[in-house]
């Protein structure tokens, strides 16, 4: 991960990066604002619209953290400027999905309906056409929260392997 950590991150227009004294990285852009605590061992600086990360030594753990925080920052910057999107198809006979605000109502073949509440940062759309499988499209500026929500939805009814 140390090679990833050495690469600078160019900031797109409309994205501001602030580094506080207690090593909290704040990225603000047109789609939202994200915060990330960074290990004090990892140094950060912004020069001429470019974010740089540095490390004090070449120990294995330090190299890993160097690349980790650089990758997290890159995802934050991409999220507040472009956003992230996941598309899931619900495959099964009689399966239904309906979104109302941030609550999804799913009928996944159980004897009861499942109500799944999403984080407020996630925007969801469902498309259900007659004769086709329902499609869930989720968008957010936070990649971690979006991936976690997608994994939880998938775990409600695992795909049939056959």
Model-derived segments and spans:
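Structural preference for solvent-exposed beta-strand-turn elements
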Residues: 1-162
């Amino acid at each position: 991960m140390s090679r990833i950590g050495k690469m600078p991150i160019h900031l797109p227009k409309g994205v501001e990066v602030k580094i506080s004294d207690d090593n909290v990285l704040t990225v603000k852009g047109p789609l939202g604002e994200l915060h990330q605590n960074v290990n004090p061992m990892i140094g950060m600086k912004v020069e001429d619209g470019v974010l740089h990360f540095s490390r004090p030594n070449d120990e294995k753990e330090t190299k890993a953290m160097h690349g980790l925080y650089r990758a997290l920052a890159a995802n934050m910057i991409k999220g507040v400027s472009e956003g992230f999107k996941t598309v899931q198809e619900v495959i099964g006979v009689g399966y239904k999905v309906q979104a109302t605000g941030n609550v999804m109502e799913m009928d996944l073949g159980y004897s009861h309906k499942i109500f799944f509440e999403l984080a407020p940062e996630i925007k969801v759309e469902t498309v259900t056409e007659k004769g086709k499988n329902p499609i869930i499209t989720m968008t957010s500026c936070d990649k971690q929260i979006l991936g976690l929500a997608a994994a939880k939805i998938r775990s409600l009814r695992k795909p049939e392997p056959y």
